[in-house]
Amino acid sequence: MSAGTATDTTDLDSFFSAHLAETDPEIAKAISQELGRQQHEIELIASENIVSRAVLEAQGSVLTNKYAEGYPGRRYYGGCQFVDIAEELAIDRAKRLFGCGFANVQPNSGSQANQGVFMALMQPGDTFLGLDLAAGGHLTHGAPPNVSGKWFKPVSYTVRREDQRIDMEQVERLAQEHKPKVIIAGGSGYPRHWDFAKFREIADSVGAYFFVDMAHFAGLVAAGLHPSPFPHAHVATTTTHKTLRGPRGGMILTNDEALAKKFNSAIFPGLQGGPLMHVIAAKAVAFGEALKPEFKIYAKQVIDNARALADTIISGGYDITSGGTDNHLMLVDLQKKGLTGKAAEAALSRADITCNKNGVPFDPQKPTITSGIRLGTPASTTRGFGVAEFKQVGSLIVQVLDGIAEKGDGGDAAVEAAVKEKVHALTDRFPIYA
């Protein structure tokens, strides 16, 4: 083809029509294998879920081609009239879901949403209060390796040793002592409800902003089955996956117009450039799904299933931190059995039950070893598991853990093989994307 001539039409036809399996069989194979893993394994990672085919379609749409720096009606690029529709729908649906006045749907993750709040409300070196990571907090709430722990001065509150519930007396004492600019409620491993009204009272007493990170339980809030951060919080952030069952991403919510402007500026141009419009469209689809009556039924089942799973594991002789759960997750404390989270995660994985090792309050083990595992019910509930199935899952987990307790970290191969067979029989009854 000579210089200056049009691209060969055969090449163009292939570019626009060839499927992934034709153009990149290695990636196509990896995706196919991951679909098989999701179909045949029981997913109990509390931060994971399974999205609808409609969400997949939106995220894989031509909106991936469009740059749209700025906000709807105020873009720095032309040709944004249709992606504006998608973002405006996402914003409107988010506000309806959570009963708030303002929503920023552009954060690429929950971590970036949290960073945006920090940028808007604090200066480097300012003090904030958050739940200790070891007690169920989150990396972005002041862990030393995270930017939140490097740029700011985190002060951590924890849970009471006797019942593993938030120590509100300690929260109040630390707030009075350190006078933080921001107080955070929320975390990644706390299975109980939060006293948002009391947190706001404490924040007001020291002139602090009250910030709720509801990444894990936002879907339960949207369904009206978990206390809402509003009207207590000055700001709330969330991921859009987990219990909200959307694409991976983040969001900032508030009722304060002045703060909303600060959050918008913090996200763009403060932290991000062009937003991911295909992901924002997928967020809008998921929010639309969450506004339907069926989502409330789903969210209630998530909670019922979590309680059934926790009760079954307790009946099997294992401890659950705080004695149970109010939401979608639980921490299994393995200390009295002499087990580690690392060994438990590996053994369950061999039986095709997926979870993650997790620290428990006052854990003597290193974060890479841990004394517990975290379990969650959103993904398996999405595929149709009910209370009966989760009781069976709990029994299977106990069998695998007992095998480690009896035979060491290598586990009981015969038990794990038998459990794996039962896992496949169960997952075959509940296909995904069939």
Curated annotation (Swiss-Prot):
InterPro entries: PyrdxlP-dep_Trfase, PyrdxlP-dep_Trfase_major, PyrdxlP-dep_Trfase_small, Ser_HO-MeTrfase, Ser_HO-MeTrfase-like, Ser_HO-MeTrfase_PLP_BS, SHMT-like_dom
Cofactor(s) needed for function: pyridoxal 5'-phosphate
Localisation per UniProt entry: Cytoplasm
Pfam families tied to this protein: SHMT
Site residues by UniProt (Plays an important role in substrate specificity): H241
Subunit field text: Homodimer.
General function of this protein: Catalyzes the reversible interconversion of serine and glycine with tetrahydrofolate (THF) serving as the one-carbon carrier. This reaction serves as the major source of one-carbon groups required for the biosynthesis of purines, thymidylate, methionine, and other important biomolecules. Also exhibits THF-independent aldolase activity toward beta-hydroxyamino acids, producing glycine and aldehydes, via a retro-aldol mechanism.
NCBIfam families: PRK00011.1
Family: Belongs to the SHMT family.
Protein name in the entry: Serine hydroxymethyltransferase
Organism of this sequence: Methylorubrum extorquens (strain ATCC 14718 / DSM 1338 / JCM 2805 / NCIMB 9133 / AM1)
